[in-house]
């Protein structure tokens, strides 16, 4: 009996330990996987500044292209595709946080007009679902359903990102009208150069903080360098810390200037933004236009028939 109780206690303890470990893993893992959206969402209420600049450019300093494709016009309460393309050289590798080289990831933010939002799963067609793949979209804010973010995701698989969008219906949403609306997009490939607190990442150039001579370079055990510079003005020693990743450009005994690059620029990615326009079309206007075209065609047909009838009458009178 005592043996059975002891076994039950051990079993219960193991089960509890496993459960706690799983919970800790989930809590720690979640922020890492959602790092790209969280950086922007935590720091900025709106991803697009008053100047039109998307805030992702504050961390991703290099300028790269991005393209968006949307229909010219859509009807109310209709699901359509907004395709964002983030091109880059598939052969290049980026510097990871640990200093090693790895594949690039991509991310995007899509700023839709008020009323437009992510389409619900039951409204998305199988064809669009196939294009979406395993992508997971989220709202920039719970109250801003018209601003969507995605990433980071593997760039080799998702250089082209398809957003399923549901257009609003002005008959049910009084603040939406049948007009032409702008759509804004921002897309990045690779890691940023600046963190949200303003500090540099290891995906950046590191410059000398003093002018003088490089006295000593110590290679750290976990990667990176510690560079000692003797200041040319007062002879004091200045230590610059280089994280793992960037390649060193200077050597011991070399004279350097203030702000001279100590490392190469490891960044191979960058950020770009673009825009497009879409018309929320009134179905009655479309029907009226079709009716107008149909009436013109019928008028042309009747005119031709009348002309032929008139020619027959003239011909019969001449023969008479």
UniProtKB/Swiss-Prot annotation:
Record: residues binding heme: 36, 56, 59-60
Spans traversing the lipid bilayer: 286-305
Cofactor: record remark: Binds 1 heme group covalently.
Intracellular or extracellular location(s): Plastid, Chloroplast thylakoid membrane
GO biological process terms on file: photosynthesis
GO molecular function: electron transfer activity; heme binding; iron ion binding
Annotated InterPro entries: Cyt-f_TM, Cyt_f, Cyt_f_lg_dom, Cyt_f_lg_dom_sf, Rudment_hybrid_motif
UniProt KW keywords: Chloroplast, Electron transport, Heme, Iron, Membrane, Metal-binding, Photosynthesis, Plastid, Signal, Thylakoid, Transmembrane, Transmembrane helix, Transport
Signal peptide: 1-35
Membrane topology type: Single-pass membrane protein
The organism's place on the tree of life at top rank: Eukaryota
Cofactor: heme
Main subcellular location of this protein, as a coarse class: plastid
Gene Ontology terms: cellular component: chloroplast thylakoid membrane
Short name of any one Pfam family annotated for the protein: Apocytochr_F_N
PANTHER family the record matches: CYTOCHROME F (PTHR33288:SF10), PTHR33288
Protein family membership: Belongs to the cytochrome f family.
Function, as annotated: Component of the cytochrome b6-f complex, which mediates electron transfer between photosystem II (PSII) and photosystem I (PSI), cyclic electron flow around PSI, and state transitions.
Subunit and partners: The 4 large subunits of the cytochrome b6-f complex are cytochrome b6, subunit IV (17 kDa polypeptide, petD), cytochrome f and the Rieske protein, while the 4 small subunits are PetG, PetL, PetM and PetN. The complex functions as a dimer.
Protein name: Cytochrome f
Organism: Glycine max
